[in-house]
Amino acid sequence: GFGAGMARFIVAVGHRGPMDAAFLGQPAPDPAMFGLPVEDDGNRTDPLLGQNMPSCPHFEPDFKALRAASTRIVLGAGVESEGQMACRGAFAVAERLGTTPVRFPSGHGGFMGGEHGQPGDPDGFAATLREVLAQA
């Protein structure tokens, strides 16, 4: 259900390093650890888990077209996300584009102020974002 799926997702995105056999063989996390429901309501329509996760891992950007684009493409990565999936992804895409990601304060959700259980650095994030946008 949603709780079990989201608990696995949270553990996966917070994991530092490769998702090797040892990581994948770990027991499933308890959804209650994250304040998520433990029962399976049978619903599989969650936008993240039911729609995006099945298709996102198979998507590969057209890097040639992106490099040729007239717009500036800026990748960002949170300094506290080092080694995590989102940060590794930002660096991998940036490398293919021949650029370097901008490092934002905090982690993957650095723009949040804790309202969803992920305290970030919204003021620091905003300052860095303003710097990036000023370079346009």
For each predicted feature, which ranges?
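Catalytic active-site module of serine/aspartate enzymes centered on a nucleophile-bearing elbow/loop
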Residues: 88-91, 97-136
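Alpha/beta-hydrolase
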Residues: 1-92, 96-100
